[in-house]
Amino acid sequence: MKRSAFNAIAVDTKEFQNSTKNLSDALAKAPGMKLRESGGVGSDMQLMLDGFSGKHVKIFIDGVPQEGVGSSFGLNNIPVNFADRIEVYKGVVPVGFGTDAIGGVINIVTNKKRRNWFLDGSYSYGSFNTHKSYVNFGQTFKNGFTYEINAFQNYSDNDYHVDAPVEDFETGRIDKDKRVRVKRFNDTYHNEAVIGKIGIVDKKWVDRLMLGFTYSHMYKEIQTGVRQEIVYGEKHRKGHSLMPSLEYNKRDLLIKGLNVALTANYNKNATANIDTASYKYNWLGDRKLMNSPGEQSNQYSRADNNNWNGTLTVNYRLAKIHMLTFNHVLNTFRRSNTSLLAKVESEDAIAKETHKNISGLSYRLMPSDNWNLSVFGKYYSLYVAGPMATTTNQDDYVRTTRNMNSIGYGAAGTYFILSGLQAKLSYEKAYRLPTIEEMFGDEDLEMGDISIKPESSDNLNFNLSYNRTFGRHSVYMEGGVIYRNTKDYIQRNIADLSGGKYAAKYINYGKVLTKGYTVSARYGFGNWVSIGGNFTKMDVRDNMKTSISSSAENLAYKERMPNLPYMFADSDVTFYWRDLGRKGNMLTVSYDNQYLHSFTYYSSRIGSNKGDYVVPDQFSHNISLSYSLQKGRYNVSLECRNFTDEKLYDNFSLQKAGRAFYGKLRVCFGN
């Protein structure tokens, strides 16, 4: 990745593997990256990358897109031991991923090195009755037969304290200026996942042929809605997922230099939303009988999702300096909804379905080790069918269909100015097709819009990096500037429903202009100490001169887009004491912090009550201690997160957990 012309970095997860961190925690260390969660373990999570967040950033595991795989495989639910490294591509995305991301790509790379046998297992326990466990074992025989099992689980009561306004049931009022310290009481989460693979490796006719099967299950209680004054006492959801998969790789197929990779999977998952309580709750756990059931909307429904995904990647290298890459991704999705409220199940008459095709072709020129250049083109196609409301109160629907087609293109180049000093420049005319959630919602707290349009963006990156070693001293510095001119920007807003209830909705927001920069640095002294940090500033502005719905002047023109952090930083220092107590043992002590500058989650031109909609400055601190024996075979770790007990917020001022303690035991055998 270092010599790649694309704005890309790799996060090595090895330093985190004795910690209780998940993949999203490890990613938060990347420059320009901000992790945004709505609560504790299992909560909704978004990754913000260089000013883009949520659906703008696409997730892959070993190059396979993770759309529609279910919440058990959210990055905040996967243990960090699952990955060997994490690749981050910003803005301009290589053809090989076959995706429509305009914000970037996160690629989780697992360890595929051939090993005779291995076992990696861990268990952790911590605050809020949090239990996490992970096991990965497998074996490769001399005849090439191989198998591997990955399994993990997360459980937490998530019963941490928050400061929230409490509704007075006698008056029916909520004093938003009066905050009471209360304990979350309907927020239990647990998920379990098992991934099994068997196959053949390192044969003349195939380098890797694997058949896999994945099962996952999740249960999630829902404590609050999109605002913290909303309280649920019994609302919850549950679901499961089944996914068979195929993976094929062959280098030098038929002719030298022709490499082919093929993946395919079918994901069938079902999610049930249960909201049938006859009581209304406040933050004290008090309740009162309602006139009709349903805390948000009276429902006991099941959404059955069927998702097919196939990818084909062909690389052809000619005369060492030329590389052609072709990639095609096919994705089909179908959802049917069934109401379970009645004694007889009733299924929606109109199913929701999509067919997405993305093709890409690139050429890479590599005349020397000092520079290389890539040019590429992409074709996007999306067919959508589903219900569209014919009345304003959305009580009548008709089936509608849409076709969307776009062509994108771009180029990327890199040049080593001096030894260790590298420059990168890249541009892409990028498109992002609407996601399933944006078009169809989640059948609960997210409202979809089937008529929403694709986003388009002109993405430009420029980066300089310097890497040098002086004896026992090592220095790495990197700086980058970005420019994004986005049209039909898809924005997540809050919809005010009847009866004081709220949901999220998606709209196209005309034009948005993003400019920003990131700076990162790291210093190491031998094998004893590592210290580094990142700083990010992103200016994401409303670039619409007129209102979306009329020709009237847009009062928010040139104002910052709401609910987007625009300045944040992090730093860390780690000390290593090797051969402590015995040769092969090591004590590691780490400290890290995160700073977030205040931002508004509504437009900054909202009038005199602007302070009510501000997420305040935040500065949190974490510390961890780990002791490894026999070259990492046995490991014990202790962590304290947010040890100064700061009040932390992310999405629409939803409060996260305060000070928390965790411990972890890990064993690792094999080669």
Listing of model-derived features with the role each one plays in the protein:
Residues M1-F16, Q46, V57:
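N-terminal periplasmic "start-of-domain" segments of outer-membrane beta-barrel proteins
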Residues S24, A28-P65:
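Extracytoplasmic beta-strand/coil segments of soluble accessory domains associated
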Residues V64-G91:
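Short acidic/polar hinge/loop motifs at secondary-structure boundaries
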Residues R115, S124, K142-Q228:
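Periplasmic-side early beta-strands and strand-to-turn transitions of outer-membrane beta-barrels
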Residues F416, Q422-E428, R432, E455-K515, ...:
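Membrane-embedded beta-barrel scaffold of Gram-negative outer-membrane proteins
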Residues Y431, N485-D488, I531, V589-S620, ...:
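C-terminal beta-signal and adjacent terminal beta-strands/loops
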Residues S474-N485, K505-T600:
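Gram-negative outer-membrane beta-barrel transporters
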